[in-house]
Amino acid sequence: MKVILKIRFNASSESFEKFGQNRYFLYLSNPEHEHSSQIIVKILSRKLGVPLEKINFAFKDNTGNWVFDVD
């Protein structure tokens, strides 16, 4: 299944909210950097209850959404 995230970096507090079928808002207090996708995979694993190895970063679309494949 595909999971789509709208991510706001540098937020005042961290939160994870569902807003549709396989769509989530993720607010992170740290800035975006080259290892952001690895951090997000760990958060998704914890929040969705899925093992780390079953979640893979797919792409970042042209609207800024982050797309992950969850097996």
What feature does the model see in each segment?
Residues 1-71:
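Contiguous, often N-terminal, cationic amphipathic patches that form binding interfaces
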